[in-house]
Amino acid sequence: MLFRSIVLVTSDGKRAIEDHFDASPDLEAFLEARGDIEHLRVVRAVSDMVNLVTVRQKEQLGLGHAVLMARDAVGHESFAVVLPDDLIVGERPALGELIDAHEETHGSVVEVMEIPREDSVRYGVVEIDPDLPATDGGRTIPLRGLVEKPAPADAPSNLGIVGRYVLTPKIFEKLERTAHGAGNEIQLTDAIQALAAEQPIVGRRFSGRRFDVGSPEGWLTANIDRALDHPHVGGRMRTWIDARLRER
């Protein structure tokens, strides 16, 4: 499964996301004049790495609606959905793990992780199929269904969906017929639930570390984590953190 394009589904006031991936002639000229070839290559690589398509979601009707807006850009191929407020870091890319599971099962795949039962109201929660065995050391799990943000007493498992999916194009038909659900939104989980009656759906436990960068604490934690692993600033960050901890 080879990705040739990135489809950004955005809304009003989010041009900065589009601009980030666009060419930056002024910045490139500045870096070239300074002789900063290393950073010049990085800036140019961002705009050259993939074909970028932007789609506007004019109404905020949920994740399922956002995915449906990308239908014409995606076409009739399987595709990945990546939510930017979930950052997963590991030796092996989390999305690559999902793609492997998709190619093995020829179905749709959702990324999952264990969550406290009381947190079920914040996640889509999966229902495990007890009649089919898990594979790959228990990391790839056949599913019977999904429920969006159930009450703890109603949650079918303690596995919550993280913001990574690989879906077949059949999902678009289901999204078109999906009624507004939780929060009066078109829920992607409801459409995947309908899809489960026709093709395999599996959950995939990721092997890395996950950060919720949609929260202030998660955003700060993710930045510190990535800074500590950075080849240029990691050493200085560790020294500074050690010094701060000793002060306290």
Regions found by a protein language model. Name each.
Residues 27-32, 37, 43-130, 167-169, ...:
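Conserved beta-loop-beta/alpha segment of the NTase-like Rossmann-fold superfamily
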Residues 80, 95-103, 131-238:
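Catalytic-core segments of class I nucleotidyltransferases/pyrophosphorylases
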Residues 7-10, 112:
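Short internal beta-strands
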Residues 19-25:
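Glycine-rich loop at the start of a catalytic domain that most often binds anionic cofactors/ligands
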Residues 16-17, 191:
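Phosphate- and divalent-cation-binding pockets in alpha/beta enzyme and binding domains
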Residues 1-2:
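Short, small-residue-biased leader/transition segments that mark boundaries at the very start
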Residues 11-14, 21:
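Residues in the short beta-alpha loop(s) of Rossmann-like NAD(P)-binding domains
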Residues 237-248:
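Intrinsic disorder at enzyme termini
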